[in-house]
């Protein structure tokens, strides 16, 4: 995993670039915003476990204590089909009924600005998903975690989104039927339709470039609104630079 939780087998640390702010009234560190937007997918058999992990449920409840982590927000389920009373049921059904070798879920892992308040981070994520997940009616769950870097001690807020490509079209189906193959002649007889991420794009690579650029623009708009500049000291001089990110800096 990209974001390291002390005490969890999740190798690889991450810290934001630290710049010192030189002000007579304050000597605190400030951070340039950082860009991280990874896209992963997992086959059936992993969805329920991952939902429990990001939601810190059952066997993962102890992570909060061992890693000194804050779970800032959990959205258990949006755009869920009618058979779902608890999102656990949806992800369990994906593991049980998805076809062999089918993707049970896609995950977006997104770094969030630690100079934002938890409420601002939540709004930042919600408004992005309202544009890029909700219109397709992808059933999804997400959580915002904040864990301190083992290297710098700074906050590392980030979001884990997981969603199914089986779009909720509002037709009543059982859990088993929902994951069957789509029937274009009579949708009520088959499963929900899979809307592939690359639909409307030349190919999957084109989609990845598009969605990462969309996050860059979305985050930069919010940075311009809430914390547009960063000031630091170089050779005794205060230098103020624009606080913005670039998807081009992201190591794929």
Segments and roles (model prediction):
Residues 2-252:
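N-terminal nicking endonuclease/strand-transfer module with a His-rich metal-binding environment
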């Amino acid at each position: 995993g990209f974001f390291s939780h002390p005490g969890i087998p999740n190798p690889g640390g991450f810290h934001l670039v630290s710049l010192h702010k030189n002000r007579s009234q304050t000597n605190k560190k400030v951070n340039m915003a950082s860009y991280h937007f990874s896209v992963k997918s997992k086959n059936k058999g992993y969805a329920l476990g991952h939902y429990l992990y990001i939601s810190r449920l059952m066997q993962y409840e102890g992570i909060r204590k061992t890693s000194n982590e804050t779970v800032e927000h959990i959205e258990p389920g949006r755009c869920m089909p009618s058979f779902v009373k608890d999102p656990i049921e949806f992800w369990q059904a994906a593991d049980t009924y998805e076809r062999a070798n089918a993707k049970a879920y896609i995950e977006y892992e997104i770094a969030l600005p630690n100079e934002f308040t938890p409420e601002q981070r939540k709004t930042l994520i919600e408004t992005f998903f309202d544009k890029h997940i909700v219109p397709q009616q992808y059933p999804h769950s997400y959580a915002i975690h904040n864990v301190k870097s083992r290297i710098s001690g700074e906050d590392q807020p980030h979001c884990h989104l997981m969603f199914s490509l089986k779009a909720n079209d509002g037709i009543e189906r059982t859990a088993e039927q929902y994951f069957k193959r789509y029937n274009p002649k009579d949708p009520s007889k088959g499963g929900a339709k899979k809307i592939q991420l690359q639909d409307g794009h030349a190919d999957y690579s084109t989609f990845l470039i598009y969605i990462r650029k969309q996050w860059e623009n979305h985050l930069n708009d919010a940075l311009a609104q809430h914390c547009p500049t960063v000031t630091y000291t170089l050779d005794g001089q205060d230098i103020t630079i624009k606080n913005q990110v670039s998807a081009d800096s992201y190591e794929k």
